[in-house]
Amino acid sequence: MAVGVFDSGLGGLTVLDAVSRRLPEVPFVYYGDNLHAPYGVRDAEDVYELTTGAVSRLWDEGCDLVILACNTASAAALRRMQESWVPSDKRVLGVFVPLIEALTERQWGDNSPPREVAIKHVALFATPATVSSRAFQRELAFRAIGVDVEAQPCGGVVDAIEDGDMILAEALVRSHVEALKRRMPHPEAAILGCTHYPLMQDVFQDALGADVKVYSQAQLVAESLADYLTRHPDMLGLGAEPGFLTTGDPKSVSNKATQFLRRKIEFRAVEPL
């Protein structure tokens, strides 16, 4: 009954932590493609090939349902995967859906025409690849009209977090927020469009100001997954053991992951498919 969680590196651990707390009875298998991280500077074809390989590995681990806890993969690969690659007995879900549900206050199954929503000015902070894909704006446009989205590519932040350099990460976040606010001085809401960024949520909030509502994905994804599994209990795979897989150095990744989650995490090495 295992569920897979995939990320290019360690950022998806924020999602894993939230879904594990929300669904303690479900075993989760986490796959971090640390060898190829970060994805945010790769082109769409490269991201697609790496993501399909990772998802295939999680299927081999008995996870019929896989969460792409990586915004770059969700933006650059998910639609193509769902349209032409994922078999009918498997599911791959991305992390944009819960964000857009929260922002527009309407369910994903609601296919009525787009309508006006309360929030008009949204700041999007994401990797360069996610920003260039315009996937968030495209999905939002299906459900809402009249929303001005200003996107800021946050180069360097993921690398700093993966390296454990939180001082550099904070400086970069403040610089990126300042750059965005020169173009959109008064955003009403901010989307942290990378699963690494919740680790810096307090810094984003401080730099943006207390009056800006900051949407972070981990809790939203956890609630969305719980709802999905209630409606589709058959998508719990045959895998029964939780685990942590990495294409990187397992000792180094384990040490960093333990620092991330403040509990002992042990990864085992796998070869990328």
From Swiss-Prot:
Pathway: Cell wall biogenesis; peptidoglycan biosynthesis
Catalytic activity: L-glutamate = D-glutamate
A biological-process GO annotation: cell wall organization
GO molecular function: glutamate racemase activity
Active-site residues per Swiss-Prot or TrEMBL entry: C70, C194
Record keyword Cell wall biogenesis/degradation present: yes
Binding site for substrate: D7, S8, Y39, G40, N71, T72, T195, H196
Pfam families xref list: Asp_Glu_race
Matches recorded under InterPro entries: Asp/Glu/hydantoin_racemase, Asp/Glu_race, Asp/Glu_racemase_AS_1, Glu_race
SUPFAM superfamilies hit by this protein: Aspartate/glutamate racemase
Keyword vocabulary terms for this entry: Cell shape, Cell wall biogenesis/degradation, Isomerase, Peptidoglycan synthesis
E.C. code: 5.1.1.3
Family assignment from sequence similarity: Belongs to the aspartate/glutamate racemases family.
Annotated function: Provides the (R)-glutamate required for cell wall biosynthesis.
Protein name: Glutamate racemase
Biological source species: Dinoroseobacter shibae (strain DSM 16493 / NCIMB 14021 / DFL 12)
